[in-house]
Amino acid sequence: MTMFNTIKREFQYGNQQVVIETGRIARQANSILVHMGGVTVLVAAVVKSDAKEGQNFFPLTVNYQEKMYAAGKIPGAYGKREGRASESETLTSRLIDRPIRPLFPEGYVNEIQITATVVSSDKTQSADIAALIGASAALAISDAPFNGPVAAARVGFINGEYVLNPTLEELKESDLDLVVAGTKSAVLMVESEAAELSEDQMLGAVLYGHQQQQIVIDNIASMAAEIGTAKQQYTAPVRDQALETGMKEQFGAQVSDAYTITDKQARYSKLNEIKDAAIVALAGDAESESYSDTVSELKEIYNDLKYRTVRDNILSGKPRIDGRDLETVRALDVQVGVLPFTHGSALFTRGETQALVTTTLGNTRDVNMIDSLAGTIRDHFMLHYNFPHFSVGETGREGIPKRREIGHGRLARRGVQAMLPDSDRFPYVIRVVSEITESNGSSSMASVCGASLALMDAGVPIKAPVAGIAMGLVKEGERFAVLSDILGDEDHLGDMDFKVAGSKDGITALQMDIKIEGITPDIMEQALKQAHAGRIHILDAMNKVLPESRTEINAHAPNYAVIEINPDKIRDVIGKGGATIRQLTEETGAVIDIDDAGTIRIFGENKAATKAAIAKIEAITAEVEVGKTYEGTVARIVDFGAFVNVLPNTDGLVHISQIADERVENVSDYLKEGQIVKVLVQDVDNRGRIKLTMKGIEQS
């Protein structure tokens, strides 16, 4: 009798063979082991059978982790253990969470924890697709009321062709890195960066990925059917009809009027005032045992009333919350150079959303070293997004970036990264920081706009300005409305969050999260069309202030220069044990990097520091010229002449017969060590030996 009851499915997925199995590892949880190409991921899902008392939100937690042993590596952190989640791991956790969360029933609050662990990797591909497939399969075989399965695909675009699940090497040649996740019938999530692809090309990639992932969904469904786990029966609590009727009849008109208040804080204040009045009017006796439950139910009913009011207004053709029509972008204000001592800065305001964005240029020592399964990554570009509580008029503890901030920062980075110059052309390390100072929707896209402006203000020669816009959707049956430049409320109460960034020529980043099924290609096409019009409108406003990068690097930024030397002279610049280059750095304050080909990159604090470093290096590496007179120092006296140092690390011989016009019997009668003399270079032989003469040269 075998100890394990293993069930597995095998299938070809692009160029990778995929094996999904359960029943052999982590049997006390709903576990799946996914082998995909050279990657193995263990995914375990634990589903609580009951909700915690008083639980009022869905406590779904996804943790993705990469174990260094998976690639045969020992962690470099203190204690040689894996530390807290890296930025990449956090982003993958979000990637798994986003398409899974909408597939649970509304009101379901049982705790679910999903842990995805990369346990083996050949370092040729990312493990995120395998992890998401594993999470979907683990939930499918569990008793959770999960309306899946869901699957994921990565799509590249190489030589004009879509490529399914490209390797890391293939992605280097690809104009697209897109991840799409969905169910059998619907796309739920898209995450991508691109090199200015068209709307049609991006939509084609989404549809291609969704079509290709059907084989994954079929195999997961087949496995779940074979296992046959009975699902938890969840029925949403029945609302008190009298409370719903009372709320709508007494306060429906007031809520509708409140949603004509264009100022966010004033609108929120009015809506809270109406909510408090509704509780007083409808909750009954505050001393009764059921009072707190009634208040909780009334708050849910009130939220539903707000939800229905906003959506009905939009679908009936009424103006949006702030008075706009479906396609109008909020009022824009663009300023650059707002912070005098930063290297580049911009203040981008769109309605009640505002980003203060800075660019800082650093030298090669500022590069971000990232330890990953694939090896150490040298990241020359960073974009950090900060969302303080005051940006929405709230208080709270400030600390390390939360998952949302990391995700928004990565999206903004994707939006501008394709426009950055190659590091060979522009070797600076670049750090962009977006401080969200006001927020009412689409702060990540404001960060894209602000980042583009701050980079240009710093003198970074980006290929083209970039702008971003967030689109929304309200859909009821066959009726739908696509909204341009959504507010925070429209994001919260709508069915789709669709963010698009790009230049005038194409899309550089696209992120989509859909909360409902039934989003058709026609709807996505309409959203992309409106996003294009909105993006061009925003770019026009930005270009009126700063149409292209400044021609010179900001005066406060490090000054950069590159020079070439004879590779044979590299050792002279470095010196014994690095003594010479350390001295150069200490004397000039410049950062100096030398490669094996003799290319020297110099970053000075200012132009003077860079020039000083260049002058010293040129002196060290200078070659003597035959026929040229030099002033040198007598370095050593020998019987047959004297060695004179004419250049740093360069000595030549003045033979005893070349010291004076008359015959010299004793060199020491004419020269002393340390004496300054003028010499003429007579010859340099094929071994590099330098012959000098003092004859006929007037000595001072």
UniProtKB/Swiss-Prot annotation:
Domain S1 motif, chain residue ranges per copy: 627-695
Pfam family, one: S1
InterPro entries membership: ExoRNase_PH_dom1 (IPR001247), ExoRNase_PH_dom2 (IPR015847), ExoRNase_PH_dom2_sf (IPR036345), KH_dom (IPR004087), KH_dom_type_1 (IPR004088), KH_dom_type_1_sf (IPR036612), NA-bd_OB-fold (IPR012340), PNPase (IPR012162)
Matches recorded under PROSITE patterns: KH_TYPE_1 (PS50084), S1 (PS50126)
SMART domains: KH, S1
Substrates-to-products reaction catalysed: RNA(n+1) + phosphate = RNA(n) + a ribonucleoside 5'-diphosphate
One term of GO molecular function: 3'-5'-RNA exonuclease activity
Cofactor (UniProt): Mg(2+)
SS bonds (residue pairs): none
Subcellular location per the Swiss-Prot or TrEMBL entry: Cytoplasm
Limits of the KH domain: 558-617
Binding of Mg(2+), residues: 491, 497
Cellular component terms (Gene Ontology): cytosol
Biological process terms in GO annotation: mRNA catabolic process; RNA processing
Range of residues in the leader sequence: none
Superkingdom assignment: Bacteria
Top EC category: transferase
Subunit structure comment from the entry: Component of the RNA degradosome, which is a multiprotein complex involved in RNA processing and mRNA degradation.
Function: Involved in mRNA degradation. Catalyzes the phosphorolysis of single-stranded polyribonucleotides processively in the 3'- to 5'-direction.
PANTHER family named in the record: POLYRIBONUCLEOTIDE NUCLEOTIDYLTRANSFERASE, POLYRIBONUCLEOTIDE NUCLEOTIDYLTRANSFERASE 1, MITOCHONDRIAL
Family, similarity comment: Belongs to the polyribonucleotide nucleotidyltransferase family.
Protein name as catalogued: Polyribonucleotide nucleotidyltransferase
Record lineage: Bacteria, Pseudomonadati, Pseudomonadota, Gammaproteobacteria, Moraxellales
